[in-house]
Amino acid sequence: MIKQKFSFAVVVTVLLLGLTSCDDEFTPNAEWREIPSVFCLLDQDDDTTYVRLQRCYLGDGNLYSYGSVADSLYYPAGEVEVLIRVWRNASDMSVSGATPIYVLNFTREMRDKVEGSFASGPQPVYCHRNMPGELDSAYTYELLVRRVSDGSTMASATTRLLGDPDNTYGWLKSPSPLSGGGVVTFNMLSGSCQIKWRPIDRGRLYQPRIRFYYRYRFLPDSLRYADIPCDAVKQTSTQILELTTAVIKEHYLNEIRKKLESDTNHKKFVDTVSVIMDVADENLNAYISSVTAMDGQDYQSYNNIVGGVGLFAARRAHLMERVRSDKGDQPNGMHSLLENLNVGFQQNDL
């Protein structure tokens, strides 16, 4: 396995909500060719699936002219349709006269991104409200962008969902999930804590994080948290039965300090944390790898859209298990470590 530091949650945000625009009209003088730019991530735990669809142009004209024109970025309402056909087997798609199990239809909606990178006003996004059973890891999903006027396919791609955790054992092995009744706690007594988990089908890149909980001393019902990222892990073989990473004490405490140092409230210790796991499939892993290489001169952006550019991939972003956190009173126990951060924890209130 290969470890790297990367949070693909950021990439996902850019994929779905990423571009700004202006109001000029598109009148390039050079020859050009229009192609769709399509981004979609499937997660069976999402209540809504989004497709980001834009137009991009290939040609020899001025890049600033091509890239800065609002009217050139989006297809007008009613010009294209977006749908996902669901097949029991990938081979069925090439069988003459075969029909999918069902079809997921998308509606065009205007959405705002009001803060952060690429903040902008209303932009069109294609949405489908997921119904129970529609997203099944056993099926193959075929994304289609079609021109309404003649029904022709402009862009297409296929993917499968990531697998589900084992029904009996789950995905997290250590520390012990509270739901499983195990005895291995999340602790820093040895200077680090090992996180161990079972791979899921078609998972290739795993990004764990620790959700550190705390309460305000005078608001005991105010459960709050700070997310602490861990090293990402790549799965390099389907034969691997266990993946692992380590949460280093110095990194963990430093991240807590940075996230809480501006909060002057008196805080209380909570004796549990959550282990959260974000997972990417091979397509998303390849795309992330190409994005991280963009700071060099020679790179090739990953693309799996037939007839266009972009990405159709699968992820898991909702895997979370609560575990017991050690609160030992010894000098290297969490009581003393938190108090020494000087961010509002006190030994007699922990």
Where are these regions (language model features)?
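Bacterial N-terminal signal peptides that target proteins for export
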Residues: 1-9
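Hydrophobic helical h-region of N-terminal Sec-dependent signal peptides
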Residues: 10-16
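C-terminal motif of bacterial Sec signal peptides marking the signal peptidase cleavage site
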Residues: 18-21
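A sequence/structural signal for flexible, mid-protein segments enriched
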Residues: 23-350
